[in-house]
């Protein structure tokens, strides 16, 4: 992918791979660029609303909710392993169904097929990889907002990609103006989501006129 081209060309062999903490950030950053582009390309409020709705459902829901539930499943599995228990497919299915049921309550009916979703992607369970999706999305949101609000935003994002693994996640995030030693990037992300919802509501009102 693109970030590895930048880092390969800018770093030594030993520093080309960026931290797992934010390795998914470039892909979700591109998703934000796409939804922004579509919103501003369309003239019809319905199409604009469509673009922003997919930002919420495809980018944020998938990375903040779906992977959160997979991480919760993973944590329970690890706890059982540390307790000396042996796990088979049936046990893993029951754990996943339990996690989904506790999260959704009576709002969503969880069937036996949903319990199989833990086996979708094996790399989700490589070194707590599930957590990188939400962490990376906070980073990509910070980069996107920096791009929109700073004349140097594009340059800084490219420098972020070029940094590869030469810096710590804390240092790399600072290239795009994000201090992840605080909760501000997360709070900014939450505010951005709120603003997106408000804009969707405005487009809906336009359609009702």
Model-inferred region functions:
Residues 6, 17-46, 56-57, 62, ...:
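Post-HExxH zinc-binding segment in Zn-dependent metallohydrolases
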Residues 54, 58-70, 74:
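Solvent-exposed, amphipathic alpha-helical "stalk/arm" or coiled-coil-like segments used as scaffolds
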Residues 10-16, 39-52, 150-157:
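Short, glycine/acidic-rich hinge or "gate" loops at secondary-structure transitions
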Residues 1-13:
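Catalytic Zn2+-binding segment of zinc metalloproteases
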Residues 10-18, 53-58, 78-80, 120-121:
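Short beta-alpha connecting loops at secondary-structure transitions
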């Amino acid at each position: 992918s693109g970030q590895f081209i930048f880092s390969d060309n800018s770093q030594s062999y030993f520093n080309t791979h960026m931290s797992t903490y934010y390795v998914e950030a470039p892909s979700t950053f591109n998703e934000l660029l796409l939804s922004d582009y579509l919103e501003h390309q369309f003239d019809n409020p319905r199409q604009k609303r469509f673009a922003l709705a997919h930002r919420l459902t495809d980018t944020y829901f998938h990375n903040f909710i779906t992977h959160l539930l997979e991480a919760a499943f993973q944590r329970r599995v690890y706890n059982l392993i540390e307790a000396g228990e042996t796990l088979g497919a049936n046990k893993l299915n029951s754990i996943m169904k339990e996690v989904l049921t506790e999260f959704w309550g009576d709002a969503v009916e969880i069937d036996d097929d949903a319990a199989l979703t833990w086996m979708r992607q094996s790399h989700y369970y490589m070194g707590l990889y599930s957590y990188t999706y939400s962490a990376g999305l906070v980073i990509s949101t910070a980069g996107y907002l920096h791009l929109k609000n700073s004349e140097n935003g594009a340059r800084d994002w490219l420098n972020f990609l070029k940094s590869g693994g030469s810096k710590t996640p804390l240092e790399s995030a600072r290239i795009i103006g994000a201090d992840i030693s605080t909760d501000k990037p997360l709070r900014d992300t939450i505010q951005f989501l709120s603003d997106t919802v408000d804009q969707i509501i405005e487009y809906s009102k336009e359609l009702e006129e």
